[in-house]
Amino acid sequence: MSNFYVVIPARLNSKRFPNKVIANLFGEIMIQKIYKACEKSKAKKVYIATDDKSLSDLCLGFTKNVMLTSSEHRNGTERVFEVAKNLNFVDDDIVINVQCDMPDVSPINIDFLASMVCKTGSLCTLYTELSKEQLTDENTVKLVLNNDSQIIDFMRKTYKNSSGKFKKHVGMYGYNFSFLKKYMSLNQANSELTLSLEQMRFHENDYFFNGYEAIIDPGVSIDSPEDLDNYIHHNE
């Protein structure tokens, strides 16, 4: 498999749960725990991308691979692009964008996602099964696949007339740098703004993701203070 890189975009002023990336998880902040897990993957390098100087300073306490990005970026994908551009990535370089809300992110899943990008040359992401509670939880992003493993929609709310079966989206994206350049050339999509789902900019412009089932249970996503409390309670 070709070399690949992991970039973790992070910010403190998240609309849904401010400061979650520095939540204390048994002596480590969340972004530190996620970074250490990503380092166990086969990635050539793992980088953190943030527009916040205080968060950058915190991260420099456990890694040198921190890039302070522009405050003008509208989402994590744009921050990932800046890192890749500044590091002179070439079009075929594979980038794995790992969201900073999965404290138990698996390096095996990261390697698998990178292998699928290498194999297909497509936009790729992962999914897992939904629980009944997650089906109606708008903090849980869902996706619907067709029979060719192509994702035909992402959503927060489920709707009755959807063809296909709902899956839980795992917050991890894989693509070649060429797709990141394309992303930056596209206008923001309406659903990107209304749903706060950055991948919809690709989707609404007919660049579709392939979805693959995660090899390892990706664990919970921390999307709310309640999620954090539950995670700590179950892991004490």
PLM region descriptions:
Residues 105-191:
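Conserved core of the sugar-phosphate nucleotidyltransferase
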Residues 47, 53-112:
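Short phosphate-binding loop-to-helix
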